[in-house]
Amino acid sequence: MDSEIAVDCSPLLKIYKSGRIERLMGEATVPPSSEPQNGVVSKDVVYSADNNLSVRIYLPEKAAAETDSKLPLLVYFHGGGFIIETAFSPTYHTFLTTSVSASNCVAVSVDYRRAPEHPISVPFDDSWTALKWVFTHITGSGQEDWLNKHADFSRVFLSGDSAGANIVHHMAMRAAKEKLSPGLNDTGISGIILLHPYFWSKTPIDEKDTKDETLRMKIEAFWMMASPNSKDGTDDPLLNVVQSESVDLSGLGCGKVLVMVAEKDALVRQGWGYAAKLEKSGWKGEVEVVESEGEDHVFHLLKPECDNAIEVMHKFSGFIKGGN
């Protein structure tokens, strides 16, 4: 029974009839490092003891040696369709180390429980718990000294790729409705960066959107694996952010947005559509879209040394260093 496959989503994962889940990628991890890597040190800190969940915190080595160095704060949510990858994988450790070095910021990379064992909305709930934990440091009296001493809570940025970008959107919306810290008058978020955001719908978003039915069916099946209780499938407002009439973006809880998309990515039109909907919503901030020509989904993670990935990092770090 344990060898009989119920669902085969290779090269991502397999689910066996016994209920066992075999993830085929994104399971490797690397430890944090007290020795500088690219000028950055890191450590893991528990944010939810009840669920055994941690964040990985990154800090420029030079800031660690100073007691009064306040830096922008980046909170990052990893991608993987809500199903694969972790905050501790070599891919994300490398990306966050590079991001912190380029942006001269403090970063908190959030690990959350994954579907299908923990279906949506668990990844969103864990992410919100992590974000609230981060903001317990706003007065300088939180659990983690690196955040108490070095995080500038007037310059907080959220970012994520793919499913992580989806999480970022929902965190920014929720932050506009619920205070992240007592006494905080606004959301506490300066801006968000959505890297190849995972939004989708049953029907193409426009005439340029992919009409490949096989691909669209695969994406729907993958979503239903993560969110089996979604009555509307990929038209669930958690995923169909762009076309759903029930989703109002006017209350997005930040002042500026950077959306980064890739020309060959099936999700490219969703990113453009998100920005267009945001501009039309009555939201008062500024939004910019940057498209990487000739590239596919999360290419910047897969080949970080290519010219287009270097340009992505340049835009990414510039957004953070630009402040409010």
UniProtKB/Swiss-Prot annotation:
The keyword Ribosomal protein does not apply. It comes from the Eukaryota. One of its GO terms (molecular function) is carboxylesterase activity. A motif (Involved in the stabilization of the negatively charged intermediate by the formation of the oxyanion hole) lies at residues 78-80. The keyword Zinc does not apply. Keywords: Acetylation, Hydrolase, Serine esterase. The active site is at residues 162, 265, 297. GO terms for cellular component: cytoplasm; cytosol. Its EC number is 3.1.1.1. It is an enzyme of class 3 (hydrolase). The modification N-acetylmethionine is found at residue 1. Gene3D superfamilies: alpha/beta hydrolase. Carboxylesterase acting on esters with varying acyl chain length. Belongs to the 'GDXG' lipolytic enzyme family. This is Probable carboxylesterase 12. It comes from Arabidopsis thaliana (Mouse-ear cress). The lineage of its organism: Eukaryota, Viridiplantae, Streptophyta, Embryophyta, Tracheophyta.
